[in-house]
Regions:
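RNA-binding accessory domains that recognize and position tRNA/RNA substrates
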Residues: 1-163
Length: 163
């Protein structure tokens, strides 16, 4: 576990012993697993601890996830209206992801595409991107080929984190 970062991203702290699944690669943090949220209104204001219900973080924002003891677990997108409150993007700190968001997601998409090409090189129809399995929560992309050989891509956005 890496230490707490010095950036300004909101921090979601899990309840005691709730980190095990995240450490094993599970991509979701449920609302009942969250102890509190630490954030500040702007760079000049003080950090404040609030319950999930009280916190004013805008849904769709990048947050960092920590153990109760303060060990860094990963970064994800928050949606307080969902039972799946945080969808993990990866084990990078928020500033690494936000430094070049476009490049970050292009890399994730290319990694997913290259993996599928290895397994489906002789197939004309398959799932290109499989959401959380590719660390792109809520995004499903499928490639289909019809009898005339035309290729179609079907895209589904299944969560706020993807929109």
């Amino acid at each position: 576990m890496t230490p707490m970062s010095m950036n300004n991203f909101p921090r979601v702290f899990l309840k005691n012993k709730e980190e095990k699944e995240i450490q094993q690669g599970f991509p979701w943090v449920f609302d009942n697993e969250i102890s509190h949220v630490k954030h500040r209104a702007d760079e000049k204001s003080e950090w404040k601890n609030e319950s999930l219900a009280e916190c004013s973080i805008e849904d769709g924002k990048l947050v960092e996830v920590y153990t109760k003891a303060g060990g860094f677990l990963g970064s994800g997108i928050i949606n307080k209206k969902s039972k799946i409150t945080v969808r993990i993007l990866g084990t990078e700190h928020g500033d690494e992801i936000s430094a070049d968001t476009k490049a970050y997601f292009e890399k994730k998409i290319l990694e997913a595409f290259n993996m599928r090409r290895m397994f489906y090189k002789d197939s004309d129809s398959y799932r290109l991107i499989f959401g959380e399995a590719d660390f792109i929560p809520g995004l499903i992309c499928e490639r289909f080929c019809d009898v005339k050989g035309r290729i179609f891509i079907v895209v589904q956005f299944l969560s706020l984190s993807c929109e």
